[in-house]
């Protein structure tokens, strides 16, 4: 799974010895290798907006093989493309405000997150990606194995490549509990046997963390689940005799921030 970025990363140019970045409008050229699957869309729900996730399939071929893999890429589209009433009231910018906010989600890979608005967009991207993908995985499981999701992990393994998709952990918990009726213990059993995590750095400044306020603003329910994971983690560490200072350092939530790597380490069955 991935996201279908309109401009990708950037088109590189060197001028006077310096790199210049320009939009890479690759989709505007004919590109026949992505197939739109509009009938298989999913709805991703933020507290301030709902977004349509439209899947596109890209074939992944190998040399000398007899099969072809599929990479499913999600494009973000608004629920309503155009606010006619706002436009007719001559509030022209307002008429496309929601549309452009949604398109921002899949506009550029790694948008600048030096500001709070940039951080909000980064986290939106991450949640949009994991929510749409997990909804599809659950639907596929139910179609093949029925509605009892307690064996979901028997047929699905999800590799978290770095911290960017770690929001999949609380999102899978939310889907299992809120959408499909599992209790916390059953949902946690499934989740902790579904995810494996690849850690790319031990440098503290490179480990991804986000302000608590971002979670509270974008998805309060995910914040509640992360808080509960943190509470249970602390009880678990105390029961194992881990000293409080060490337990606090590795806790999923501390010092006003959500620590994505520590969530991944605590909730994954394998780490490399």
Language-model segments: what does each one mean?
Residues 1-272:
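A conserved ligand/cofactor-binding region detector
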């Amino acid at each position: 799974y991935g996201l279908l970025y309109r401009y990708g990363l950037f088109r590189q140019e060197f001028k006077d010895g310096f790199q210049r970045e320009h939009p890479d409008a690759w989709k505007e050229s004919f590109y026949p290798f992505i197939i739109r699957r509009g009938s298989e869309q999913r709805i991703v729900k933020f507290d301030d907006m709902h977004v349509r996730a439209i899947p596109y399939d890209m074939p992944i071929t190998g040399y000398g093989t007899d099969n072809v893999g599929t990479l499913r890429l999600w494009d973000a589209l608004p629920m309503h493309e155009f606010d006619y009433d706002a436009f007719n009231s001559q509030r022209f910018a307002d008429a496309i405000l929601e549309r452009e906010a949604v398109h921002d989600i899949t506009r550029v890979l790694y948008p600048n997150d030096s500001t709070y608005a940039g951080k909000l967009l980064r986290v939106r991207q991450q949640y949009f990606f994991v929510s749409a993908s997990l909804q599809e995985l659950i639907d596929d499981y139910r179609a093949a194995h029925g509605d009892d999701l307690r064996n979901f992990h028997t047929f699905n393994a999800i590799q978290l490549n770095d911290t960017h998709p770690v929001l999949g952990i609380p999102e899978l918990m939310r889907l299992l509990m809120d959408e499909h009726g599992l209790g916390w213990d059953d949902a946690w059993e499934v989740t902790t046997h579904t995810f494996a995590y690849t850690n790319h750095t031990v440098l503290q400044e490179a480990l991804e963390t986000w302000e608590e306020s971002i979670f509270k603003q974008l998805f309060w329910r995910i914040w509640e689940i992360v808080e509960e994971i943190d509470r249970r983690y602390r009880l678990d560490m105390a029961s194992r005799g881990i000293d409080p200072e060490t337990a606090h350092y590795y806790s999923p939530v501390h010092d006003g921030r959500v620590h994505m790597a520590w969530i991944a380490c605590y909730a994954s069955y394998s780490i490399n």
